Design a protein with these regions (language model features):
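A hydrophobic alpha-helical transmembrane-helix feature that marks the membrane cores
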Residues: 1-244
Length: 244
């Protein structure tokens, strides 16, 4: 499955001339805490939506056939939704943005259901627990560290492109060693991105970008959601033997 993070949710919404469209607002500590808590809340709800859809897909052969037969359309829709939410956030209401996020989470649940179904249950549980622990540790680090993690953003996006290119090359070579390397790099990459995103959320960078705590919380939730899902998928590759 292609990495939905390649849609670059780090891009700031701009006008046709390239200037920011959101007004600058002052972000105090209370606003920062409210924003961070809302971002995590919507992220967890999005994960529950994806998990619920993935479970239903795993129990329904008809849904599996539907997802398999429309996989390309699902991937295109996921990319379009990620672009739409990230780049169009200032042109839509917070309610619409949140609704689109949940639609995105549900569509990704369809593809996740297919992926998870191809692994042993023990591997899935181990990958989920490991991803949860690493995500939690990175989130705590991003919250408490005094170190500026700004440089991680640009480096990580280039790393994602590198992973995608390596994955495409590996389709032809089917190298288990390269698969392991890609998976390990992916785990490190999205662990670092989690810390980076949490720090930016706490600092109120997304509130400044969108001019709204509610809208910024949706963008924050999308980023954290993608961090966790990709971390889980790379961990699943490792626990599943790296052959898929």
């Amino acid at each position: 499955m292609s990495d939905p993070r390649v849609t670059n949710p780090y891009a700031n919404p701009t006008t046709a001339t390239g200037t920011p469209v959101a007004p600058a607002i002052v972000v105090d500590r209370r606003t920062s805490i409210a924003f961070l808590s809302h971002a995590f809340l919507w992220m967890f709800v999005g994960l529950l939506v994806s998990a619920g859809v993935a479970f239903v897909v795993g129990e329904s052969r008809q849904l599996q056939q539907f997802a398999e037969g429309n996989l390309l359309m699902l991937l295109i829709a996921q990319v379009a939704l990620a672009f739409g939410i990230s780049l169009g956030i200032n042109k839509m209401s917070a309610t619409l943005a949140l609704g689109l996020f949940f639609v995105y989470a549900a569509s990704l649940g369809l593809t996740l259901g297919l992926i998870i179904g191809s692994y042993p249950q023990a591997s899935v549980v181990s990958a989920f627990l490991s991803a949860s622990a690493m995500f939690g540790a990175a989130a705590v680090y991003g919250t408490v560290t005094k170190r500026d993690l700004s440089s991680i953003g640009a480096i990580a996006f280039m790393g994602i492109i590198g992973i995608l290119v390596a994955s495409l090359i590996n389709i032809f070579f089917a190298s288990s060693e390269l698969t392991w390397i890609i998976s390990i790099v992916g785990v490190v990459l999205f662990t670092a991105l989690t810390a980076y995103d949490v720090q930016k959320i706490q600092q109120g960078a997304l509130v400044q970008m969108t001019g709204s705590v509610e809208k910024a919380a949706v963008i924050g939730a999308l980023r954290l959601y993608l961090d966790f899902v990709n971390l889980f998928l790379f961990m699943l590759r490792l626990f599943g033997g790296g052959s898929r």
